[in-house]
Every structure is written in structure tokens, then in C-alpha cells.
Amino acid sequence: MKINNINLLAGVLVMGSLLTPASAWAKKAGYERLKDGVVVTAPDAKVRVRVINDKIMRVSATPEQEFKADSSLVVLPKFQGNANNPQFTVTEKKGTVEVATSQIKAVINEKNGQVKFYDHNGKELLVENQNGRTFTPRVTDGVKGYSVRQTWESLNPDEGIYGLGQHQANEFNYKDKNEELFQYNTKVSVPFVVSTDNYGLLWDSYSLCRWGNPKDYSQLGEVFKLYNKEGKEGTLTGTYIDKDGKTMVRQEPKIYFENLIRGDLAHVINLPKNFDYAGSNVTYEGYIEPSETGLYKFIMYYSGYQTIYIDGKKVVDTRWRTAWNPNSYKFQVNLQAGKKVPIKIEWEPNGSVAYCGLRVYAPVKDGEQLSWWGQMQDMIDYYFIYGKDMDDIIAGYRTLTGKAPIMPDWAMGYWQSREKYNTRDEVLGTVSEFRKRNIPIDNVVIDWLHWKQDSWGSHEFDKERFPDPKGMVDSIHDMNAHVMVSVWPKFYVTTDHYKEFDRNGWMYKGAVRDSIRDWVGPGYLGSFYDAYNPDARKLFWSQMNDHYMPLSLIHISEPT
């Protein structure tokens, strides 16, 4: 669940109000030949194109005088810096510089730094928009960087774009779609896309990123005129009916009940506090009036049951999500400027703490959706991968990021997983029952809270509920099944592991300083370790090995 908003994960960000002006630095026009590519100096940025192999090129751009030293968490070290020794040619032609291999060619415009990609037959594959990159200065905790954006022309209206990880909004083709990239329970973000037009893009960034629209979704009242159910302008009408039939009515300027109050796990920001949501029914209704005609893209945030109607039509059939773990769902509606249409949101919270939200993107111009935005980066940095088909493109991705290990046969079988097992007997009984019924099973996942309630991060089984964990694992192995345990980079302050990280300065301590307790039992203080520190990662791994490996357990993290 979200405690406040995503920006808290990155610290307080201060945005510069203007794009970096060309007058801020003086650069000599032209290009420089590198061992593995070229650097072109354009009026607003230096653009570097490096050849990785005959099918992969790396494009970097910076408004600074020099590029920052290479450092990547996802690309193999041998492809960083200029250690690579690829075969390519460089040709200067009429204001452009061409970098060509046996399979692809990049053409860089010397005037504006625009990059175009072609295959070996001269077919245009991908084209950056002219003036399609922006750098907006930002500062985070005293560290300077840029909010960056890169856009490309959409050459083929029938193109399909797939990837971006594992998201939960029921979208697969991301052409003309929007997706926010961050890590969240059941949401896995991977900044890589594959196109049906024979290319892939790896966006090398670890900040909050957005594919498509670079802006955050707007509140309804920022895009539409709102009217309550009586027709009065300014709000929607919220009607709250508790399980006993007691009714409360409020005027709602926005439907944005998505974040817990800091330090208060019992209440959601903006929702009425003096109301019992368990077993209740809530309705938000009224009218919206758009100022322009076009396709409006909505995002709903929900837990419990939620249904949405616009202009008398059910645009979102009833969706459910467990109350404590909300999800997002996206839909779009064509609306006409000046036409007021009814809107109704039906919500059953299904818990004492639940979430509801509805925000929107106004229509965007054609060609603005093939875009990548990063909240805080040193530079624009992406890899273009050519392939004869999707499998070939994925092979290029693996070339850059490392080979995918071949899984053992049992890993292709059925995995039994549930929210949690409460006792050793539950685990053994489950596997035993599968065997009795001759239902194939290869792996059982022991998820969270196998530790003592107050010991998250101890990597120890609760001895009362899971006596003799080694014997439990051996028994499962004797039934010809495997065991997997979920682990987290989260530690309660009372655990020895937290203290070990803290002594080295490897804990994010904002939640501890702010006394933010989690939702387990009475609520406990804890936080996460700094996984960007290589020594901290080694410690995390060693702690798991010390406690889990003697039990012959395999480790996973969530989401899987």
C-alpha cells in the first residue's frame, strides 16, 4: 500500500521551471569519433551513439559539457565505457553523421542531434522526434540531476509495443498507452519494450519513469467541470451508508482516497474519519463536462468492489481487490466538448481501511505517446536493439543484461502458493493432500509471516508455529516436492539484522524517524535497506544464506 506518494521513495524533489537553455553552455558544432561510436554536439545537448554489436546501439544525451562516468545496474560491465571493440563505419553526409554496422545504421543530425535508425536494407525502423528530448533540472537531497524525456515518431499505426514488466491493469499492447514504472506489491516494472516493427528499447534508468504521457494523472476537477447530483457546479456528491444504514453525505471536489495518513494506518487521506467502512456502501455521483472533444484516459485506484458508469454506460464492470492491497485499472471514454454527462462510482470498501480513486488524462495530440520520461537521471540513456523477430530482440536484451538461466524441470511444474501458511502442519498437510489426490505439485511457497510477528527481517521461522523447520523441509522433499520461501528487504528495528545494516549506514530510516508503523498486529517500526549499495547487497545475501540455506531452502522475492 502507499503511505503517501511515490515521490517519498526518492526524497523531496525540486523542479526547475525551465528547460536547460542552449545559452547555458557553449559547444563547438560537429562530431567526434570514438573507439566505439561518435559524439555529436548539438545546440542543446551532446548526443553520443555507441555501437555494442552489429544489432545493438546505445544512445546517450546530456546538457552538460561532459558525459558522466558509465555506471549501470542492469547492463553488463563489458558493454559500459569503451571496452567494447565492435565493427562499424562512420560517414559524414550533408549535415548528418552515419554510424553503420552490417545490420543497422544510425543517422545523427548534426544540427539538432536527432537520431534515426535503419536496417541494413535502408528501411526506417525508429526515428526520434526533432527537438524530442528535454532536460529539466532537479535537485534531490542536494544531488543535482535532470528530469528527462525522449520521444519518437510513431511510424506505423499498426505497430504493437509489448513489455514494461508485469502490471495489473489488463493492458498488453502499450502502443498509445501509458504506464508508470515503479515497484509495488504485484507490480513489476522493467524499462524495456519490444516492437512488432523489429526493434526493442531498453531505457537505462532506476528512477520513477513513465511510458507514454510524462505527466501524472489529473484530478477530475482539473480537467472537467464537476457538478453534484443536484446540478450545482464544483463537486460530486458522496453518499456514505454504513452497515447499519446510517447515511452521511459530503460534497467531494476530487475522488482521491489513495494514501494513508502518515503515521496513521487506520485512516486514508481525504476520507471521512467518523465513519465505519467495513460493510459499508459508498456512491460518488454527479456530472462531468469536458472542455475539449477527444479520448479521455482514466485510471481508477480501488480495493474492495468498485463499478463505474459514465454517460449512463457501465464503463468498468465490478472489480474486486483485497481491501489492504489496492490496485489500478485503466479505461478510456470519448467525450464531447461542452456536453455534460452523468458519472457514478459505486464502491463497497470491503474492509475498515480501503482505497478509492479516479483520475484522468485529457486528450493528447497524435504522436505524443511514443515517449519515455524519467523523474531523476544524469542523462538520457537508452539502447536500440534490432532483431528479425521478437525472439531475436529478446536475445539482444539478454546480451546486454546477462543470460537467462535455464530452469530445472520441476520449476516448470505446478507451484502451490497462498497468502501465508500459519503453521508447519498447514504446509505439510497441503503437500500431503496433493499427493493423496494424485494432483501433481512440484513446489510449495511459504510466504510471509513464517517468522515471529515482531521479527520481520530475522529470517527465522517462528519456533512455536514452525518447530523443526529442517524436519519440515526434509518431509516435503521426501514427498518429492520443493520448498520456496519469500524474503523481503524489510527489517524491524528490533532485529539483529536491522542493527547490522544500521551500524554500516545501510538503512533507509525515514519511516523510523517519522515513527511510521506498519499494519502487522499493533504496528511495528521498520524500514528497508539500501539495495543500491553493493556491500549492503552482499550482507543481505549472507544473512539469508546463514539462516535459510542450512534448511535447503530456495529464496524468492515478491513479486515473483
Predicted regions and their residues:
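The substrate-binding groove and active-site-proximal loops of carbohydrate-active enzymes
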Residues: 383-386, 411-424, 454-467, 520-543
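Predominantly extracellular/luminal regions of secreted and cell-surface proteins
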Residues: 221-265
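Catalytic domains of carbohydrate-active enzymes, especially glycoside hydrolases
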Residues: 426-449
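Short, surface-exposed beta-strand/strand-loop-strand elements in extracellular ectodomains
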Residues: 305-315
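Residue-level detector of conserved catalytic or cofactor/ligand-binding positions
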Residues: 551-560
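Active-site-adjacent "subsite" loops/lids of carbohydrate-active enzymes
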Residues: 489-551
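A low-complexity, Ser/Thr/Gly/Pro-enriched, surface-exposed linker/loop concept
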Residues: 27-31, 35, 50-97, 135-138
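Catalytic and substrate-binding clefts that recognize carbohydrates or anionic sugar/phosphate headgroups
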Residues: 92-231, 245, 296-300, 310, ...
